[in-house]
Regions:
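An N-terminal, well-structured beta->alpha segment
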Residues: 1-2, 6, 12-51
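Glycine-rich phosphate-binding loops that contact phosphosugars or nucleotide phosphates
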Residues: 51-154
């Protein structure tokens, strides 16, 4: 029976930490070319929103969306996260035509999110999407689309 080594050298931990931060910093810098007119218009739409910013997404995109909503709310912008599946169970009532939906999906083709979009459109709520696929259905149905490309997760 072998004994598990529970000690990791500090240099190794530090090296992994530094590498992760470098990769995250580079991933952010890689987004600069995608800051186009749609980005400017999307920011303007959210800034001038008379209601709430409703952030939505499924899976990891949902987790990112929840963080975005929490950050917006904590800095003074009325915002919350809604799981697109929850709208079928009464959460649609919190939305009005004064709101803006910020929809996140890496593929832009997430089935649960795409079933939610017609309800948003029916309520005349503008949609800003952030996806890795500018030709996706989600991008197509959005007022403004922002492309984000993620090569690798740190």
């Amino acid at each position: 029976m072998t004994e598990k080594n529970n000690h990791i050298e500090d240099k190794t931990v530090r090296a992994y930490g530094e590498q992760a931060l470098r990769e995250e910093a580079q991933a952010i810098l890689d987004q600069i070319p995608f800051l186009d007119e749609n980005f400017e218009k999307a920011v303007d739409m959210m800034y001038n929103c008379q209601g709430k910013i409703i952030v939505t997404g499924v899976g990891k995109s949902g987790h990112v969306g929840a963080k975005i909503a929490a950050t917006l709310a904590s800095t003074g912008t009325p915002a919350f996260y809604i799981n697109p599946l929850d709208v079928y169970h009464g959460d649609l009532g919190v939305m009005t035509d004064k709101d803006v939906v910020l929809a996140l999906s890496n593929s832009g083709q997430t089935d649960e999110l795409l079933r939610f979009i017609p309800m948003v459109l029916h309520m005349n709520i503008p949609i800003i999407s952030i996806t890795g696929n500018p030709k996706s259905l989600l991008a197509k149905y959005s007022n403004f689309h922002i492309t984000v490309k993620v090569k690798k997760e740190a």
